[in-house]
Amino acid sequence: YMTWDQIKEIEKEDFVFIGNHSHSHDYLVNYNFEKFKKDIDQSIKIFEEKIGYNPLFFSYPFGEYSLEQKNYISNKFTYAFGQHSGVIDFNKDKLELPRFPINEKYGDLKRFEFLVKLLPLQYKKIEPEDKLITRMNNPPKVFVEFFNEQQNLKRINCFSNEGNEWDKSEIKLENKKLIIKFRDKFLSRRGRVNCSLNDVDGWRWFGIQFVVEKN
């Protein structure tokens, strides 16, 4: 971990941006809404005391959030990152931006070189908007609506981890809408979908992460 003095030191650099990652770094979707707000507000208070401002950027712990929590974050931050893979473009929701993990497990140079060459697979919207899955909507009904300008959609492939097993997803294209049908319920804490398209100018990619409510 970094000390506050170290954070203040690097924060002075022109290309360094400090982000907020919550106070507890806990599984915040398990919190009731009041406890969630208290955690976020406490983190903001500490940042304001230590560096004089609350950062523009927030990163959801473990990439988990409900729609209610996302709406609260929108009143406190300008940008927020999930933990679903993908490439940022101008059409992405600025409160659920994608990010690829680069760490000791997923950080070899070959993978890094592949990731930095990826292009965004842009879309108008993804349903459902709420990424928190309950017993009532597991598996969720998922569709992705693309822009008319996106060509070669028949080349798209998706993989997902329902039933605790990564496999190729069953997909259906209706004009510019992609419908993803899951084989089973999501059994692990996080349900993931990764879609890629080998386009004329390179590989395009987007991902979705759901968090499965535990009762």
Where are these regions (language model features)?
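Terminal accessory/targeting
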Residues: 1-2, 99-215
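Glycine-enriched alpha-helix->loop->beta-strand junction motifs that scaffold or abut catalytic
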Residues: 14-18, 74-80
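Metal-dependent polysaccharide deacetylase catalytic core of the NodB/CE4 family, i.e.
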Residues: 1-68, 91-98
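Acidic, His- and aromatic-enriched active-site or binding-groove loops in soluble protein domains
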Residues: 3, 77-86
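Extended amphipathic alpha-helical segments with heptad-repeat/coiled-coil character used for oligomerization
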Residues: 84, 95-98, 102
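Active-site proximal loops enriched in glycine and acidic residues that flank catalytic Cys/His/Asp
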Residues: 62, 84-85, 146
